């Protein structure tokens, strides 16, 4: 539906971002897209692959919204120190792109609020990581 309206898909949840991003990447393969379009045809739809799946961090940062965030902050969060947990799904990127791009963008967005970003040694681990350590 996004493609039919000339729009990209913007996702807030990291897990949903990865699922939709991976699906979109798979649909770049002609055979997969043909198979999917055979099914979509029954619903009167077709997918051409023109829409991109973007994380909200990309949209806010790359579409020039970071300056708007700075402008809209009326009470800077100067006394707030934040440790960001990116989660592994935020690192999904197109081939050849910098996997640290979105985490850096998120840091800049947090800083735009006036808050300080502090290092966190587990910042890029999967949010499901603690479950894997339960039996230890």
Show which residues each predicted segment covers.
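Iron-sulfur cluster-binding electron-transfer modules in prokaryotic oxidoreductases
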Residues: 1-136
């Amino acid at each position: 539906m996004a493609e039919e309206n000339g729009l990209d898909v913007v996702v807030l949840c990291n897990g949903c971002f990865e699922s939709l991003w991976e699906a979109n990447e798979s649909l770049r393969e002609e055979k997969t897209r043909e198979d999917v379009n055979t099914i979509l045809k029954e619903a009167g739809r077709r997918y051409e692959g023109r829409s991109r799946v973007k994380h909200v961090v990309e949209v806010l940062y790359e579409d020039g919204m970071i300056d708007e965030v700075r402008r809209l902050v009326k009470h800077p969060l100067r006394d707030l120190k934040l440790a960001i947990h990116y989660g592994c799904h935020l690192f999904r990127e197109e081939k050849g792109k910098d996997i640290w791009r979105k985490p850096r963008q998120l840091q800049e967005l947090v800083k735009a609020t006036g808050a300080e970003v502090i290092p966190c040694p587990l910042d890029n681990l999967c949010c499901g990581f603690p479950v894997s350590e339960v039996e230890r």
